[in-house]
Amino acid sequence: MKHTVSASVILLLTACAQLPQNNENLWQPSEHTRSFTAEGRLAVKAEGKGSYANFDWTYQPPVETININTPLGSTLGQLCQDRDGALAVDGKGNVYQAESAEELSRQLVGFKLPIQYLHIWADGRPVAGAPYRILPDGILEQYGWTVGRTADSGGQVRTLQLNNGNLNIRLVFTEIGMPSETETQEQCAARIQ
């Protein structure tokens, strides 16, 4: 009886235990980032203040578009990058442009956000050709940011956590898929309008 109880407890604990994630496999080099679509939640904390929103994100080279939405689905703004640079469209339709997404974010919110690297980090890779370090706990350090990533058993990102000491950004991915081949664009939709 004593052995049956012990075996039952061990089975229960084993069933409830989460297998540790292999930190070495979180950041793997690959030739290129695959196209994807994603949806999820976004949290940003700066100077003790936090903001929350939903996002939908399409990465289909050469165009990358991130929409920031309210919990009810209204679009607060859109950020798009293509070969011609970066642009943002706010909820009122005002368009802002810069040579890079990092420069555009500095102009609009006062912080250089590593937006042009997010798709690479979400794909589980450090930016090629740039110095980086992977800490023992699986955290990537690159461009002055620490980047934590969790993935499902198939390697798809589930969370991406970025911190540069002043700013903390957390993306939680609820859906990830492939974009429709019929939706291929060569430039941001806001440039066409």
From Swiss-Prot:
One of its GO terms (biological process) is lipoprotein localization to outer membrane. PROSITE patterns: PROKAR_LIPOPROTEIN (PS51257). InterPro entries: LolA/LolB/LppX (IPR029046), OM_lipoprot_LolB (IPR004565). It is a lipid-anchor. Its main location: membrane. A lipid is attached at C16 (S-diacylglycerol cysteine). It is found in: Cell outer membrane. One of its GO terms (cellular component) is cell outer membrane. Keywords: Cell outer membrane, Chaperone, Lipoprotein, Membrane, Palmitate, Protein transport, Signal, Transport. A lipid is attached at C16 (N-palmitoyl cysteine). CDD domains: LolB. Residues 1-15 form the signal peptide. SUPFAM superfamilies: Prokaryotic lipoproteins and lipoprotein localization factors. Plays a critical role in the incorporation of lipoproteins in the outer membrane after they are released by the LolA protein. Belongs to the LolB family. Monomer. HAMAP family: LolB. This is Outer-membrane lipoprotein LolB. It comes from Neisseria meningitidis serogroup A / serotype 4A (strain DSM 15465 / Z2491). The gene is lolB.
